[in-house]
């Protein structure tokens, strides 16, 4: 905050389960930083939604990976579709700016059109999606999750149609090319964005395993300098190059490499 950080996003895991969540929200938002919350939506009670509105958060992004209860609950095995939809409605009723995020899988790509329609009907101002990344828990179940090439073709065809349909009313934003294309762009034009992990380590970007600092030992100002220099580190350039031959290297993103 003292460094005039303009934008903060709280994600997880699930940030709203933290006992100090609203203390952090109200502290950050009350000192001029724009704040985004990425949540599963199940904790967006009317009371919580009103507090987010009162704190003037910039947006709340909810993961809604299906347009039906059957599909959503298959994806989010500990979630409940009706609770998430109600949470979205609570946030909308409170006047909280809403975004919807959708992760494509073998069993939910066919619902993308309905999901975009639902997002608009629920009051979202933006809808985000793209190709599912080979990382995290998805690595263990990739054979069950990854859409086929044919499914992706139809998926993005529908998204292009929906983007045109909702132009001027809701932004439908999607990354069609995948993580490798994004990493190539980042090497040329790094985003001014740090990823701070719960343990204080700071990553260059979520899709790469590189650490540029530790907030328990270094100041944010020093880490920012490290961040700017790190994108030219030969290790990172080589890692992105290796991804061209082995896209599954993204599975290594939790094997921390300090630069």
Describe the residue ranges of each PLM region.
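Conserved alpha-helical substructure of the radical SAM core
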Residues: 1-59, 148-151
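Residues that scaffold the ATP/ADP-binding catalytic core of kinase and kinase-like folds
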Residues: 18, 47, 70-71, 75, ...
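Conserved, mostly hydrophobic/aromatic
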Residues: 28, 37, 62, 200, ...
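Radical SAM enzyme [4Fe-4S]-AdoMet core and its adjacent flexible, acidic
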Residues: 53-55, 63-190, 195-203, 207-218
């Amino acid at each position: 905050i003292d460094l005039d950080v303009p934008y903060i996003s709280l994600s997880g895991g699930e940030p709203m389960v933290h006992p100090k969540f609203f203390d952090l929200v109200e502290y950050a938002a009350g000192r001029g930083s724009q704040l985004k919350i990425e949540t599963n939506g199940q904790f967006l009670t009317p009371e919580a939604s009103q507090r987010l509105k009162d704190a003037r958060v910039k947006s709340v992004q909810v993961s809604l990976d299906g347009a039906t209860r059957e599909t959503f609950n298959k994806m989010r095995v500990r979630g409940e579709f009706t609770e998430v939809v109600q949470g979205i409605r609570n946030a909308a009723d409170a006047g909280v700016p809403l975004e919807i995020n959708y992760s494509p899988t073998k069993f939910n790509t066919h619902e993308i059109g309905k999901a975009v329609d639902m997002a608009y009907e629920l009051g979202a101002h933006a809808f985000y999606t793209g190709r599912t990344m080979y990382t995290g828990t998805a690595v263990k179940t990739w054979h069950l999750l990854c859409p086929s090439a044919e499914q992706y073709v139809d998926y993005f065809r529908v998204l292009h149609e929906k983007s045109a349909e909702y132009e001027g009313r809701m932004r439908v934003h999607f990354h069609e090319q995948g993580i490798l294309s994004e990493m190539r762009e980042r090497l040329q034009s790094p985003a001014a964005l740090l990823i701070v992990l719960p343990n204080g380590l700071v990553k260059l970007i979520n899709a790469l395993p590189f650490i540029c600092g530790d907030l328990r030992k270094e100041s944010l100002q020093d880490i920012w300098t490290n961040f700017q220099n790190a994108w030219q580190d030969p290790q990172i350039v080589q890692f992105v190059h290796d991804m061209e031959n082995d896209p599954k290297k993204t599975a290594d993103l939790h094997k921390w490499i300090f630069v």
